[in-house]
Amino acid sequence: MSKKNNLLVAASGTGGHIFPALAVTKEVEDKWNIHWLGVHKRLDANFIPKKYNLRTLNIKTPRKNIFLFYQYFRILMSTFQVIWILKEEKINLVFTTGGYISAPTIIASKLLRIPVIIHESNLIPGMVTKNFGFLCNYVLLGFKRTNSYLKNCKTIFTGTPLREQFYKSNLLPDWVPQGKGPLLIVMGGSQGAKAINQILYESLDFLMKKQFRIVHIIGECNQKYFNLNTSNNYVQKKFTNEIAALIQNCDLVISRSGAGTINELIESEKPSILIPYPNSKNNHQEKNAMILAESGGSILINQNNISKEVFEETLERIFKIKSKKGKNHYEILDLMKKNMENNKKIKSKIEIKKFINYFLKEF
């Protein structure tokens, strides 16, 4: 192994934490030895390259129940585990993207006086960023407005880094349904969304009659495949690595509103129907969705208000055909596309790379 400095990346759980960290890591791996810290039995092992030396902790997010004290005790024990890892691997810098693995990592790093950078991708900062952000050397923000929630932190707006595929044009995979009908990408994030899946199943007859083409990503949350006798216009998958190609080439995305998804839609200039996860902490998914809804590039439907009728009426409105100068077009969809083009893009991973490499001068 070359005599590079050692960077510990602490990111685990959902794609919203893992994918931004992966995007940054690939930008800086030429100057740093990468060590990755994740959580046992999560998505980490499926996505983290073996060369990044994945280590895992057996830790769970605290819940409001009788086992709360026990769970915080496990976080404390995890802090000692992280201290041991930091010493063993001779870590020079820690980069984390939030989530419950971040708390013991930040505490351990500060006890050893190792600099820490945390990236907060949501508009409303998560619990770890709120409570431990002041211990970090930098808190990097996915949205400028997040700064107002973190008055005691050293914040810098960088945007949220995306997977490399989103920064280049991709061809539509050949397994996607072919035809002239509008292409819908329906997904619920890396873990899936039962509510979105259910409303889609209830509306499939309507969608097939309207000749929509559908790619349905059901997610990894142990949901069973539905045995559906549908036309060739419907494809169902648990997960795909070609999500950038799907979003870039579809007509409309129907999804949750995690920060990663919001930024992928902005980069791809793609209109959407967003159905925020109602139990997200601080209602951050709804706040994320409002960014695109306020810009006119998305329609926000709260899960408590969604129904087969509302879903179908919304699609009919978006895809209502208007005639202009003898040509047919989708007036509302075209307006949503134009509004998405006006959202500012930022090459976030390049900005974050600057801050990580800044610490090279300190060693």
UniProtKB/Swiss-Prot annotation:
<dbReference type="InterPro" id="IPR006009">
    <property type="entry name" value="GlcNAc_MurG"/>
</dbReference>
<keyword id="KW-0132">Cell division</keyword>
<keyword id="KW-0961">Cell wall biogenesis/degradation</keyword>
<dbReference type="Pfam" id="PF04101">
    <property type="entry name" value="Glyco_tran_28_C"/>
</dbReference>
<keyword id="KW-0808">Transferase</keyword>
<keyword id="KW-0573">Peptidoglycan synthesis</keyword>
<feature type="binding site">
    <location>
        <position position="163"/>
    </location>
    <ligand>
        <name>UDP-N-acetyl-alpha-D-glucosamine</name>
    </ligand>
</feature>
<feature type="binding site">
    <location>
        <position position="122"/>
    </location>
    <ligand>
        <name>UDP-N-acetyl-alpha-D-glucosamine</name>
    </ligand>
</feature>
<comment type="similarity">
    <text>Belongs to the glycosyltransferase 28 family. MurG subfamily.</text>
</comment>
<dbReference type="InterPro" id="IPR007235">
    <property type="entry name" value="Glyco_trans_28_C"/>
</dbReference>
<dbReference type="GO" id="GO:0051301">
    <property type="term" value="P:cell division"/>
</dbReference>
<dbReference type="GO" id="GO:0050511">
    <property type="term" value="F:undecaprenyldiphospho-muramoylpentapeptide beta-N-acetylglucosaminyltransferase activity"/>
</dbReference>
<dbReference type="GO" id="GO:0009252">
    <property type="term" value="P:peptidoglycan biosynthetic process"/>
</dbReference>
<keyword id="KW-0328">Glycosyltransferase</keyword>
<dbReference type="GO" id="GO:0005975">
    <property type="term" value="P:carbohydrate metabolic process"/>
</dbReference>
<dbReference type="GO" id="GO:0030259">
    <property type="term" value="P:lipid glycosylation"/>
</dbReference>
<dbReference type="GO" id="GO:0008360">
    <property type="term" value="P:regulation of cell shape"/>
</dbReference>
<keyword id="KW-0997">Cell inner membrane</keyword>
<feature type="binding site">
    <location>
        <position position="285"/>
    </location>
    <ligand>
        <name>UDP-N-acetyl-alpha-D-glucosamine</name>
    </ligand>
</feature>
<protein>
    <recommendedName>
        <fullName>UDP-N-acetylglucosamine--N-acetylmuramyl-(pentapeptide) pyrophosphoryl-undecaprenol N-acetylglucosamine transferase</fullName>
        <ecNumber>2.4.1.227</ecNumber>
    </recommendedName>
</protein>
<dbReference type="GO" id="GO:0005886">
    <property type="term" value="C:plasma membrane"/>
</dbReference>
<comment type="function">
    <text>Cell wall formation. Catalyzes the transfer of a GlcNAc subunit on undecaprenyl-pyrophosphoryl-MurNAc-pentapeptide (lipid intermediate I) to form undecaprenyl-pyrophosphoryl-MurNAc-(pentapeptide)GlcNAc (lipid intermediate II).</text>
</comment>
<feature type="binding site">
    <location>
        <position position="190"/>
    </location>
    <ligand>
        <name>UDP-N-acetyl-alpha-D-glucosamine</name>
    </ligand>
</feature>
<keyword id="KW-0131">Cell cycle</keyword>
<keyword id="KW-1003">Cell membrane</keyword>
<feature type="binding site">
    <location>
        <begin position="14"/>
        <end position="16"/>
    </location>
    <ligand>
        <name>UDP-N-acetyl-alpha-D-glucosamine</name>
    </ligand>
</feature>
<dbReference type="GO" id="GO:0071555">
    <property type="term" value="P:cell wall organization"/>
</dbReference>
<keyword id="KW-0472">Membrane</keyword>
<dbReference type="GO" id="GO:0051991">
    <property type="term" value="F:UDP-N-acetyl-D-glucosamine:N-acetylmuramoyl-L-alanyl-D-glutamyl-meso-2,6-diaminopimelyl-D-alanyl-D-alanine-diphosphoundecaprenol 4-beta-N-acetylglucosaminlytransferase activity"/>
</dbReference>
<dbReference type="InterPro" id="IPR004276">
    <property type="entry name" value="GlycoTrans_28_N"/>
</dbReference>
<dbReference type="Pfam" id="PF03033">
    <property type="entry name" value="Glyco_transf_28"/>
</dbReference>
<keyword id="KW-0133">Cell shape</keyword>
<comment type="pathway">
    <text>Cell wall biogenesis; peptidoglycan biosynthesis.</text>
</comment>
